[in-house]
């Protein structure tokens, strides 16, 4: 996918974070898991019952979404249809489902 202008990327990232927030709420409700979601602009903080956190934020200069979790730090770039890990090639929702499940202690599946 060719580079986007900063405003195009910010719109794409904002939409992705909106969709991700809704998917996380649905997954937490379905699993009866306690996941607190706090969002300020381009930063989403997920806090779990044990006090651990996952941070998801957009990085306009790199045109990436960054995820910081207990499992490590990960960068995702949009390929035109989905957000893909720049190192491992995994898809954002699948990867984040795993990170969240690890930290929540229950299976959480983002759809």
UniProtKB/Swiss-Prot annotation:
PROSITE patterns: FRATAXIN_1, FRATAXIN_2. Pfam families: Frataxin_Cyay (PF01491). Keywords: Iron, Metal-binding. One of its GO terms (molecular function) is ferrous iron binding. InterPro entries: CyaY, Frataxin/CyaY, Frataxin/CyaY_sf, Frataxin_CS. It comes from the Bacteria. GO terms for biological process: iron-sulfur cluster assembly. One of its GO terms (cellular component) is cytosol. Involved in iron-sulfur (Fe-S) cluster assembly. May act as a regulator of Fe-S biogenesis. Belongs to the frataxin family. PANTHER family: FRATAXIN, FRATAXIN, MITOCHONDRIAL. This is Iron-sulfur cluster assembly protein CyaY. The gene is cyaY.
